[in-house]
Amino acid sequence: MAESVERLLQRVEELEQELARERSRRIAGDGHCGRTRIQKMSDEVVDSNPYSRLMALKRMGVVSDYEKIRTYAVAIVGVGGVGSVTAEMLTRCGIGKLLLFDYDKVELANMNRLFFQPYQAGMSKVQAAEHTLRSINPDVLFEVHNYNITTVEHFEHFMNRISNGGLEEGQPVDLVLSCVDNFEARMAINTACNELGQTWMESGVSENAVSGHIQLMVPGESACFACAPPLVVASNIDEKTLKREGVCAASLPTTMGVVAGILVQNVLKFLLKFGTVSFYLGYNAMQDFFPTMFMKPNPQCDDKNCRKQQEEYKKRAPAQPTQETAPQEEEEVVHEDNEWGIELVSEVSEEELKNSSGPVPTLPEGITVAYTVPKKREDSVSEVTVEDSGESLEDLMARMKKM
């Protein structure tokens, strides 16, 4: 019995050593990816450079400094259909650090969502995602948290990590992405970001899986999630009471991919400062419709921190430098009905026009003719008229057939 226990303890020690070696290999970048960590991005066009196509954006003038992407940290809450694909795209883009939050496990029912694989069923989503993402790009730093952010004991830790979990410990993350599938979690993220003044982006897919949206939330500047909440939130309805037994929401990998794509595109434009960042961008798969809009914050928002952020933004706005534009001199309008100064030139001279005109009638003073009747040409051919014979069309046709 003692020997069996000793063998088991020895085996446990061997496994712990193997686990430590595996962790060391992952940190060093010698894991499953087959390459070491790249210290600096290069634009060298070779097959062995994973960043050559990304750095081409700089060479083509789209982005001024693509290397800056490695200095940013992004937190993703919800590693499901949209969140996992979002994390994969940012990993492939070479983001500096990703913080992943989710409490769910991978199920076979998730296999239609593009990212997870069948052998990962039963694993926590954050662990499965980290394992796959680290093998894709070992240059990215990962921090995973397997818990529900809406619970009291975990909400404070969630706030601590987004305010101190940046690329450098103690610095806030640069952006928080909401990829959750319920309003309770969205409200928790909204509350945390309003309190911290943290910019975040929200995303979602409709229950029938044929539409979705993304929304940028800048505390104080744009509407937060509580400024114009959905009916289920405004009515304080428990979401659990709305779900029927045996009925689940639809899920299309195409819609998930589109929403994740436009979300990451907006993230890249926001971080790397190129193009126009959308405050709201919708997607309707039925009509291929992409509506955009900007929503102002609600001065009577239920979230007190949102109202506080609005007041602080109003104080900051006058101090922000405004882009001065040189005054443009307005060109004098030649004629109110002809602002372009277009002139119509006749191909006929005044003398020719006078000679070809007919007699001008005598008119009272102040009245002129718009045009004159042209003279009848003397060499014009007179019209030839034929007298009506009185025969019908049928008779004429019969006579023609006899000829």
Curated annotation (Swiss-Prot):
A motif (UFM1-interacting sequence (UIS)) lies at residues 333-345. Pfam families: ThiF. A motif (UFC1-binding sequence (UFC)) lies at residues 388-403. Zn(2+) binds at residues 224, 227, 301, 306. GO terms for molecular function: ATP binding; protein homodimerization activity; UFM1 activating enzyme activity; zinc ion binding. It is found in: Cytoplasm; Nucleus; Endoplasmic reticulum membrane; Golgi apparatus. Residues 306-315 have a biased composition (Basic and acidic residues). Residues 306-337 are annotated as: Disordered. Keywords: ATP-binding, Cytoplasm, Endoplasmic reticulum, Golgi apparatus, Membrane, Metal-binding, Nucleotide-binding, Nucleus, Phosphoprotein, Ubl conjugation pathway, Zinc. GO terms for cellular component: cytoplasm; cytosol; endoplasmic reticulum membrane; Golgi apparatus; nucleus. The modification Phosphoserine is found at residues 357, 392. Residues 346-376 are annotated as: Linker. The keyword ATP-binding applies. ATP binds at residues 81, 102, 125, 148, 182. Belongs to the ubiquitin-activating E1 family. UBA5 subfamily. E1-like enzyme which specifically catalyzes the first step in ufmylation. Activates UFM1 by first adenylating its C-terminal glycine residue with ATP, and thereafter linking this residue to the side chain of a cysteine residue in E1, yielding a UFM1-E1 thioester and free AMP. Activates UFM1 via a trans-binding mechanism, in which UFM1 interacts with distinct sites in both subunits of the UBA5 homodimer. Trans-binding also promotes stabilization of the UBA5 homodimer, and enhances ATP-binding. Transfer of UFM1 from UBA5 to the E2-like enzyme UFC1 also takes place using a trans mechanism. The UFC1-binding sequence (UFC) motif mediates interaction with UFC1. PANTHER family: UBIQUITIN-ACTIVATING ENZYME E1 (PTHR10953), UBIQUITIN-LIKE MODIFIER-ACTIVATING ENZYME 5 (PTHR10953:SF9). This is Ubiquitin-like modifier-activating enzyme 5.
